[in-house]
Amino acid sequence: MSNEISIKIGSLLNEVRNKKPLVHNITNYVTVNDCANILLAIGASPIMADDIKEAADITKISSALVINIGTLNERTIESMIASGKKANELNIPVVFDPVGAGASEFRNSTTKRLLEEVKISVLRGNMSEIKFISGLGSTTKGVDASENDARTGNDEGIDVAKNLAKKLQCTVAITGATDIISDGERVVILENGTKMLSNVTGTGCMTTALIGAFCGAGSDYFIGAVSGIISMGISGEIALDKAGKIGTGSFHIAIIDAISNLTSNIIEKMNKIKEI
């Protein structure tokens, strides 16, 4: 447990609810509704604009930009690039979720282009996606991490996150049974969460959206990433306790309920943060 970091997270949560940052999501149509609702639950304001005619204009008035390639298509790629460049121009944080990177040439080339043309603030993905981007040869299972990559040890995962963070000059977050976050210097391991989160589609996308909310309310994007990820992990534990035995549908709704009721005191009591 890290009291210093948990205090920073609690303070940033209060900032989110005070500032209500507008978070521009160019995301996928599988989870877009959940991303909007999770942002409302944490206290942020979501907007989902993916047409090239307005995407950059919407980014211009936003506090953060979230790019998610879950349901990738040619039309939205140009919107992602235009919005990303506008965000860079205005020093607006960009959170990138490279869903399924390594699964197809289309995703691979798009991920490469985004990383080349847009300065990313936080890169969040599973172990397979992050290993692929690092050039380490992953074996992705669609949009999920492969069993082999998911078994990657913490020491190796820390090296992967730190090295990629230094290379891209951003915060890298690898989420899974254990979460690893690094900005190239600082490293945190999070052990909150529950296996049941993987039974609800979109919990990763929702986590990325939450990171956008926290980054939009503060200037330390490493803490923003830690805050978004631990908020989902703790809320998953609370949801499991309240609705896990009922089924995945009730558990799904209970996650959003838990996010809406999350407080700095809950984070302080329930966090499983390890500073490395």
UniProtKB/Swiss-Prot annotation:
Binding residues for ATP: 124, 175
EC numbers: 2.7.1.50
Matches recorded under CDD domains: THZ_kinase
Names of the cofactor(s): Mg(2+)
Family: Belongs to the Thz kinase family.
One Pfam entry name: HK
Source organism phylogeny: Bacteria, Bacillati, Bacillota, Clostridia, Eubacteriales
Domain of life: Bacteria
Reaction equation(s) it catalyzes: 5-(2-hydroxyethyl)-4-methylthiazole + ATP = 4-methyl-5-(2-phosphooxyethyl)-thiazole + ADP + H(+)
Name of the protein in question: Hydroxyethylthiazole kinase
Primary role: Catalyzes the phosphorylation of the hydroxyl group of 4-methyl-5-beta-hydroxyethylthiazole (THZ).
Sites where the protein binds substrate: 48, 202
